[in-house]
Swiss-Prot record:
Pfam families: PadR (PF03551). GO terms for molecular function: DNA binding. The keyword Transcription applies. This is Transcriptional activator GvpE. Its main location: cytoplasm. The amount of protein that accumulates is controlled by GvpD; GvpD causes a reduction in the amount of GvpE, preventing accumulation of excessive amounts of gas vesicles. Encoded in a 14-gene locus called mc-vac. The keyword Oxidoreductase does not apply. SUPFAM superfamilies: Winged helix' DNA-binding domain (SSF46785). Residues 150-181 are annotated as: Leucine-zipper. DNA binds at residues 140-145.
Length: 192
């Protein structure tokens, strides 16, 4: 955990100095768990409750910082499905847990695609079977949470890097092909 904290410190580019220890993080996590546990006990409800949490505008704005919404909506449904595991893992990580209905809404909001539950739920079940997600069954829904954040990002990052590399290679080939086409057009024009 200390290595992870050190990596986080390096990634944060701020002028302010931050100091915290593993015990500080443990205290925060314990306090957060106890406050949720106490609130649950005070309700006197024996079955676990889950409150839907829509993807925040801040999270959507983060993505809009890279691509505007209209561009995200031009991404083909089959491309969204091809990257669905990575998309689901990242959305669940952003939310700190989600049910399938919320994830379907998030995908619709981000990509403008209307995937069926029959497409999304098998991916969620597979990710849970692979140990990437913890699944909690409640009365009317299943809630999915990232089981190991570090392992998740170690899985997602190479997949994203492969996709970016593939896209860059295609873009470079397209630019080269277009340049050759223009050169051929000029040569033919000069010969006339």
């Amino acid at each position: 955990m200390e290595r992870l904290i050190e990596e986080l410190r390096k990634e944060i580019k701020a002028d302010t100095e931050m100091t915290f220890t593993v015990s500080d993080v443990d205290s925060l996590l314990t306090a957060d768990f106890e406050s949720k546990h106490t609130a649950h006990s005070e309700r006197g409800n024996s079955s676990p409750q889950y409150t839907e949490t829509p993807l925040t505008d801040d999270a959507v704005a983060t993505m809009d910082g890279w691509l505007d919404e209209s561009y995200l909506h031009t991404i083909n449904d089959k491309d969204v499905v091809a990257q669905l595991d990575e998309i689901l893992l990242l959305l669940i990580a952003i939310r700190d847990g989600a049910c399938g209905k919320e994830l379907l809404q998030d995908i619709r909001r981000l990509f403008g695609t209307d995937l069926s539950p029959g497409t999304v739920y098998p991916h969620l079940n597979d990710l849970a079977d692979e140990g990437m997600l913890d699944m909690t069954e409640l009365a009317k829904r299943k809630v999915y949470r990232i089981s190991d954040a570090e392992a998740t990002f170690d899985t997602v990052e190479p997949a994203v890097n492969r996709l970016v590399t593939f896209s860059l290679v295609l873009k470079a080939l397209m630019i080269d092909c277009n340049a050759r086409y223009l050169q051929t057009q000029r040569s033919e024009s000069n010969e006339r």
